[in-house]
């Protein structure tokens, strides 16, 4: 029973719960971005290059032969996945940049400390010695 208690304590610590929430939200955010890329960005981009759907871009490495299916390299799907990644990475970058801006504490300028009584006295003695040396020459 103690192993179960240890596991429960571990799982309920703040960091683990925060991480789990972050992963779940990240997965949902990834789906939103994938939909944005597939349904909003890629169709106009395909239209600009001649009305082609990126998912259709592929190279047939070996045609189908009887019962053996064709060997196809679908680089269009890969390109769409790369666009997904770039947009997700940019969105995360912007979110972190915003969070850093919100949480960055501006350094408060420290007031210049007044010299202590000893320092003031030593400065006066130094100045007097300079005056005396200047008059003696």
UniProtKB/Swiss-Prot annotation:
- GO MF terms held by the record: mechanosensitive monoatomic ion channel activity
List the Gene3D superfamilies hit by this protein, alphabetically: Large-conductance mechanosensitive channel, MscL, domain 1
Membrane disposition:
Multi-pass membrane protein
Keyword Ion transport among record annotations: yes
Q: Which UniProt keywords apply?
A: Cell inner membrane, Cell membrane, Ion channel, Ion transport, Membrane, Transmembrane, Transmembrane helix, Transport
Question: Transmembrane ranges?
Answer: 10-30, 76-96
Cross-referenced SUPFAM superfamilies: Gated mechanosensitive channel (SSF81330)
The signal sequence is none
Q: Where in the cell is it found?
A: Cell inner membrane
GO terms under cellular component: plasma membrane
Read off the NCBIfam families from this record. Answer: mscL, PRK00567.1-1, PRK00567.1-4
Q: Say which family it is in.
A: Belongs to the MscL family.
Instruction: Report the function annotation for this chain.
Output: Channel that opens in response to stretch forces in the membrane lipid bilayer. May participate in the regulation of osmotic pressure changes within the cell.
Could you give the subunit structure recorded for this chain? Homopentamer.
* Name of the protein in question: Large-conductance mechanosensitive channel
What organism does the UniProt record list as the source?
Erwinia tasmaniensis (strain DSM 17950 / CFBP 7177 / CIP 109463 / NCPPB 4357 / Et1/99)
């Amino acid at each position: 029973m103690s192993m179960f208690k240890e596991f429960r304590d571990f799982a309920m610590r703040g960091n683990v719960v925060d991480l789990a929430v972050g992963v779940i939200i990240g997965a949902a955010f990834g789906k939103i971005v994938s939909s944005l890329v597939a349904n909003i960005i890629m169709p106009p981009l395909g239209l600009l290059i001649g009305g082609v759907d990126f998912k259709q871009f592929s190279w047939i490495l070996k045609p189908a032969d009887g019962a053996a299916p064709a060997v196809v390299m679908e680089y269009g799907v890969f390109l769409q996945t790369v666009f997904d990644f770039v947009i997700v990475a940019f969105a995360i970058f912007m979110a972190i940049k915003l969070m850093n801006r919100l949480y960055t504490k501006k350094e408060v300028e420290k007031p210049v400390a007044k010299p202590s009584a000893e320092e003031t006295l030593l400065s006066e003695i130094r100045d007097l010695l300079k005056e005396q040396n200047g008059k003696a020459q």
